[in-house]
Every structure is written in C-alpha cells, then in structure tokens.
Amino acid sequence: MKIMQINLVDYKEWTESLGYDREWKIQNFQHGFLSRLNEIAAEINSFIITYRYDSYIMLLDGVLIGKNDYILTKIKELSPVPIDICFGYGKTLLDAERNCSINMDNILLAKDEKVLVAHFDLDGFSRKRFLFDAYLEVYKIYNKLFNYAMELGGLAYYFGGDNIGIFLGVDNINKVIELANSFPNMKVGIGIGNNPREALKNAAEALHIIRIYRDRKIEIVDSKN
C-alpha cells in the first residue's frame, strides 16, 4: 500500500512566534489547513489522515502520483512554514508509513492495491443527553478500533460525531467482519474501492443500505472493476 507523508517543518517554533494570545490563532490555522488539504486530496481521489497537526498522511493507492508537483505547490501556498514530504510503500499502511523515504522510485513501480474502509457508526449516540458521556463512549470505542487496526497494519481515524473509520488492505475483510460483529450496537458499512475516495463513498453507501433495510448491521459495497 502507498502513502505520502506531509510534514510541516519547524511548526512548533512558528506557533510560539505568535505570542501569548495564540491558541485561537493556532486552532484557526489547523482546522483551515486541514480543510484545504481535504479538498486537494479529494481532487485526486485520495484522503488525508492526521493524528497531529504538523504531520499528515495522504493515501495514494489508485491515485495518479504524477500529480505530486501540483499537490506540493498547493500545499506550500497554504503553509506558513517549509514542507517536507516522503513516500512510503509496504504490505500494509503501517509498513508504508515506517518505510517512508524521499525517494519516489519504489512507489512509482509498486502495484496499486484496492482500499478497504470500514465505517463504524454507533447506534443511539445522538440520543444521549450528556455531551461528555457520549464523547467518552466514542473515545473508548475509538481506542479499541485504533489498537485493532494497528495490529492488522491499518489506520483508524475519527471522522467526528459517532463515526470512526478503519483503513486497511482488502485481505483483512474477514477480520474486519469479525471485529464488526463484536460490537452489538454498531452499524458497519464496508467500502472497497480502487482509491481512497471511492472506498469511502462505497462505505457510506453500505451504511445507507443498512439504514434502509434495517435487517442487518454489516453491509459491503465493492467496486468490482
């Protein structure tokens, strides 16, 4: 599987240069920057995952790597600090992240893999009366999914609200179904696509099917071609 890692160089030093009354400025930049990164990624059928606001992972399977210069130009226009990138390829997304290198040759020659996204949707979340109790419940589930995804070499990502995604290779489909069955109050839409955006779209369609028929809690939508 393939990734590009985008790092903001000397980001901490830049935040400290904003003065003491800076936290609102930092938050404003971080959310705005991520919003634009998501738009750029969507243009090339990719998706952005981040666990910290000075480093981002762009999923590249099924994405035209030749658009690299376009991506970098766009990102550099948005960033207040220099950008450093590396490319990773491996059997799993975790392997790809750990094999990250500035050399593009290996990733250009590597085969594109299909992308699997399991979109977990917690039942009854919106009916919970207390905000913090609801958040704590989602956080506990996210922590479990994060650790399980890591064991399989995948990445878990919190989409917001009661929605959590796991990104993996398609060879993990049976393990994902087994995991989904271990949560009694969870709908799980599994999308398989030729690129990250397509896989996410298929996962959303799978959830829609679950909501319509109400006789299942797991559904799979696969782009066969």
UniProtKB/Swiss-Prot annotation:
InterPro entries recorded: GTP_CycHdrlase_3, Rev_trsase/Diguanyl_cyclase
Biological-process GO terms, alphabetical: biosynthetic process
Keywords attached to this entry: GTP-binding, Hydrolase, Nucleotide-binding
Highest rank taxon of the organism: Archaea
Keyword flag NAD: no
Catalytic activity: GTP + 3 H2O = 2-amino-5-formylamino-6-(5-phospho-D-ribosylamino)pyrimidin-4(3H)-one + 2 phosphate + 2 H(+)
Gene Ontology molecular functions: GTP binding; GTP cyclohydrolase IIa activity
Cited function: Catalyzes the formation of 2-amino-5-formylamino-6-ribofuranosylamino-4(3H)-pyrimidinone ribonucleotide monophosphate and inorganic phosphate from GTP. Also has an independent pyrophosphate phosphohydrolase activity.
Membership in a protein family: Belongs to the archaeal-type GTP cyclohydrolase family.
PANTHER family documented for this protein: GTP CYCLOHYDROLASE III
Official protein name in the record: GTP cyclohydrolase III
Organism: Sulfurisphaera tokodaii (strain DSM 16993 / JCM 10545 / NBRC 100140 / 7)
Gene from which the chain derives: gch3
